[in-house]
Amino acid sequence: MSSVPPVLSGSEIRSKFLEFFNQRQHPILPSASLVPEDPTVLLTIAGMLPFKPIFLGQQDAPSPRATTSQKCIRTNDIENVGRTARHHTFFEMLGNFSFGDYFKEQAIAWAWELSTEVFQLDPKNIVVSVFREDDEAFEIWRDKVGVNPKRIIRMGEEDNFWKSGPTGPCGPCSELYYDFKPELGDDNIDLEDDTRFIEYYNLVFMQYNRDAEGHLTPLQNKNIDTGMGLERMAQILQQVPNNYETDLIFPIIETAAKAAGIHYEKADEKTKVSLKVIGDHVRSVVHMIADGITASNTDRGYVLRRLIRRVVRHGRLIGIDGNFINQVAETAIQLSEAAYPNTRERESFIKQELEREENNFLKTLERGEKLLADIIAKEEKQISGVDAFTLFDTFGFPFELTQEIAEENGLTVDAEGYQAEMKKQQERSKAAHETIDLTVQGSLDELAEHIHPTAFLGYTDLQSQVKIEAVLVDGHRVETAEAGVVVQLICNQTPFYAESGGQIGDRGYFSGDQLVVRINDVQKESGFFVHHGKVERGSLTVGDTVNATIDRACRRRAQANHTATHLLQAALKNIVDDSISQAGSLVDFDRLRFDFNCPRALTAAELTQIEAQINTWIAEAHEGQVAVMPIAEAKAKGAVAMFGEKYGEEVRVVDFPGVSMELCGGTHVKNTAEIGLFKIISETGISSGIRRIEAVAGPAVLEYLKVRDQVVKDLGDKFKAKPEEITERVENIQAELRNTQKELEKVKAELAIAKSEALVSQAETVGEFQILVENMGDLDAKALQTAAERLQQKLGEAAVVLGSTPEDGKVSLVAAFSEGIYKGKKVQAGKFIGGIAKLCGGGGGGRPNLAQAGGRDASKLPEALHTAKQQLRETLG
């Protein structure tokens, strides 16, 4: 029998890995975004991807070594998600990297040390593979590490020659597998047997670059790239049957199960697959949106949309009819926020995007499912290309989703027919633009063949006459729209500002004879300003000339916030660090947000100084100037540009002399005095090295202060205190609560001791030891531990195992063993109680003499305690 490794949480595994390599001169670097800088891939698919330019010699390494926990997304095996024990779309890759520093022998030695000493895997449970031609790696494993040659398996290029993609860095690799059944022996080892083996660590010896023709060129430096799947190591150390039942994912599954009114443990296999799909995909979409990806019909936005729609559909399959995705998203955020704070900081944006996509799909899902049911009922073997295209074009079913549903029902889909229908639509568009099925997103380029891009008049005009060039309803081009219809309008010219540069689009209305169209958003697509609105009165026809009028109050507020954003950047440069640059922004009607690069949080004093500086500039009434000039001239004058932004030869410069000068296409106040007031609401970190300030300006400051004043008044009324006395009153209440909590804990401890005193006489003698196994009712975990320790001390050479159910459905377990048991009999409390906890659907561990564990199924506690007693009798007798 091989020894059992300690039970560690996913967070502990991540920390131990990073700490191990940090102690060996590997700086811990933050995870890169899921949106890669590499243009050859849509998403970050591997831990090494952020280092690809270094491996290629295109960039210098920040240090010769590094270690990371990298967020990754892969969807190439999406059909296996939930059906196998370890396929995921989102996963974390723990990695250690060497950039021309150490190589094969050191990488192998550290991998073995980490596995056997830090994670305490029994060497009997480890099998390694090497590339069939890599004799050097084979010899290191055999001669330096001491692995039995029978447990070193030579594999072909497909398995053990790693590459990041069709092109790029690559090299032979050596993989470490965990063997769940070492008792089966070393003869005829088949690493493809995933019921016995799981690959958990891959060591890539990066030596080559593969070009588009497949040629291998030696890299300038030999590098090391490794990857340990966090979810896989969690499965091993938490001793659960699959990655999904680890603490990294299972709480999400439990939330989904609760929303569906089902119990995971009692569910059939089909239901469990759906729950696992939801658990996996929700992790993916939360992190994708947190990293700035939004749903669309192209590229990574399409990947996001597809994942969200799979979540919604699998929710339907397990009986969830309405909205639920944000319930499970909240659990995913709770699980990730400690390691990835941007998930909590962008919570509002994440949930808005998820709810929008969920609602959009729910609108058409039922009708699409009915069409699919009708098709399946025909008992034909294949869904036609026409039907598949209808499902995509009319009901928003991604083609892959139709394929998946078809497969579940034993059908195939005519992919060629689907592509033919797609091609026909494109040809119809070219032949007669009047009959184009024109979607707002992705098809506006076709309009450019017939009309000119929209001319923007809004820098000088707040109202103008415009000609309606196109009317779209539900993304399709129509001639006329009647009252009550939601429309997207394209005009020859417009005073409406379209959302760009962080500034929100204008609001307002179109009017004419008996016509009113309320405009609530304006977006810029392919050179056209797309006005989103609703016909409130009358009707609208292509070719009509109407009056376009923006909401002046909204424009003034947006202008004030946009200019305030410029002043904020100037103040940050003046007060904190001149090297600060913009990383993103939002200019809304009632608030502003500014993201900037800074390695630390700003102090309260700095924030006060920044706010005071901006309000001083406002009071000084600086006149603004706007000019268009060559970009070289603008930069020579010191105009600030946004890092990474692409500019044309001619740029628009917004200048408040002596205060701020920036390249900007937005709308601004003519004088800083028009802003009125500026107030910082918060300063937070959104990712490594990026900070965010949220603020209000103009009338929004008074609204904000009014709300704050009301809060203070309400608190004063509740505490019967003056505003200046509230802080002291709250501190007094907190002190009282702390004292009460201490008293409560003291009472609980006394109760635990009293209960333990009464149990001493119930101990059973087994050989030279006493054993006591009892159910302690609803005693909490801390009191349970106190009771176990007290009983073991009273009984002397004894094994005490106590269980309780302090929360609805939850289990607490404690084991306290004397020295004669954990040293003399080699029975350790941590390993023992961890095994017992598994019977309750949980896990845990601790020291040899004292350990705690938990479980998810309270109904199994009596059985678990009975098993504990039987095992102790057998072991100690």
Swiss-Prot record:
Some GO term, biological process aspect, for this entry: which one?
A: alanyl-tRNA aminoacylation
Q: Which cofactors does this protein require?
A: Zn(2+)
What reaction does this catalyse?
A: tRNA(Ala) + L-alanine + ATP = L-alanyl-tRNA(Ala) + AMP + diphosphate
Q: Does the keyword Chaperone apply?
A: no
Pfam families hit by this protein: DHHA1, tRNA-synt_2c, tRNA_SAD
Q: Name one GO cellular component term.
A: cytosol
What start and end residues bound the annotated signal peptide? Answer: none
**Keywords on record:** Aminoacyl-tRNA synthetase, ATP-binding, Cytoplasm, Ligase, Metal-binding, Nucleotide-binding, Protein biosynthesis, RNA-binding, tRNA-binding, Zinc
How are cofactors bound according to the entry's free-text note? Binds 1 zinc ion per subunit.
Protein's name in the database:
Alanine--tRNA ligase
Which organism is this protein's natural source?
Picosynechococcus sp. (strain ATCC 27264 / PCC 7002 / PR-6)
